[in-house]
Amino acid sequence: MITLAVDCMGGDHGPRVTLAACRAFLDHHPDARLLLVGQTDSLRSFTHARAALVAATEVVAMDDSVEVALRKKKDSSMRVAIQQVKDGAASAAVSAGNTGALMAIARYLLKTLDGIDRPAIATQLPNARGGATTVLDLGANVDCSAEHLLQFAVMGSALVSALQEGGEPTVGLLNIGQEAIKGSEIIKRAGELLRSAAQCGDLNFHGNVEGDDIFKGSVDIVVCDGFVGNVALKASEGLAAMIIGALKIEFSRHVFAKMAAIVAYPVLQALMKRMDYRRYNGAALLGLRGLVFKSHGSADAMAFEQALNRAYDAARNNLLDRVRARIAHAAPLLAPADAQPKPDIAATTHR
């Protein structure tokens, strides 16, 4: 039985969405159990043989600062959910709440794995091959060293290996060109480290990739710093929304366009399904001594259920042990990233 701790109060919609998603998830996973964390009055109506309520008196708001969430709201549903993972009561925690707060609390309670300086946020973006490309970091670390990028690649490889069937996942380093001589000094150094890791058998490094390769599906994993990754994520979400919105407008302009829309409906439906972010919801916070997954803050029930699915698959396939094993194997290359003091938590806008 795999147990997940769910922050039922987080996100833009709170229990109205999270509880509906939890019920659907339990219906689809007979070997799963949920710990529903939140304010008792809001969760009391939910009953299920494989669900238990865990009381939390406070809620981390989407606009709460990291300091407020970490130091003043010590009985928040987000914190109590992550505490279940620390205590061994749950295999993973899932929240749609404030990303900066989630990362700060998770890092404070769970700590980072040996050999990892900073956790990273990893999620999937749809690609032209009908699958998805895993991208990290998506906002946890705005400034990264070459060693950080190597650590992200190692953790990303473990994630994809755990969640997808197939051979060793391919890794690409996001750059302004495919040539090794291009990019900043940090990117060039990261490329050298990734090539060394590939020679040692720690990674399947493809080489440098460009932004369009994320959506071509040229590689399974794209590694970048959190600033670039977050910009790429938000740009792709905005582009997808613009395309879908433009199609709706154009097909409703006049009667002939509406007739064309009826004929093209199956194709349009398939296109919209492939571009629907809800199918890829659920970002992993990698590098911690416990599994934590972040749902999009505006997720509906379908999207939040997908985040639960991701956490369930990660726990079932022993993601944490896989990350530890890869880190141990790559330990000679994972030297201390830099001599700079670690920031408490980088500001992030990933929701």
From Swiss-Prot:
Function, as annotated: Catalyzes the reversible formation of acyl-phosphate (acyl-PO(4)) from acyl-[acyl-carrier-protein] (acyl-ACP). This enzyme utilizes acyl-ACP as fatty acyl donor, but not acyl-CoA.
Xref: NCBIfam families: plsX
Gene Ontology terms: cellular component: cytoplasm
Keyword flag Secreted: no
Family: Belongs to the PlsX family.
UniProt name for this protein: Phosphate acyltransferase
Main EC class the enzyme belongs to: transferase
UniProt-listed Enzyme Commission number(s): 2.3.1.274
Pathways per UniProt: Lipid metabolism; phospholipid metabolism
Record's keyword terms, sorted: Cytoplasm, Lipid biosynthesis, Lipid metabolism, Phospholipid biosynthesis, Phospholipid metabolism, Transferase
Assembly, per entry: Homodimer. Probably interacts with PlsY.
Annotated localization: Cytoplasm
Organism: Verminephrobacter eiseniae (strain EF01-2)
Origin superkingdom: Bacteria
Reaction equations catalysed: a fatty acyl-[ACP] + phosphate = an acyl phosphate + holo-[ACP]
Claim: Transferase is one of the keywords in the record: yes
InterPro entries reported in the protein's UniProt record: FA_synthesis, Phospholipid_synth_PlsX-like
Molecular function in Gene Ontology: phosphate:acyl-[acyl carrier protein] acyltransferase activity
Biological-process GO terms, alphabetical: fatty acid biosynthetic process; phospholipid biosynthetic process
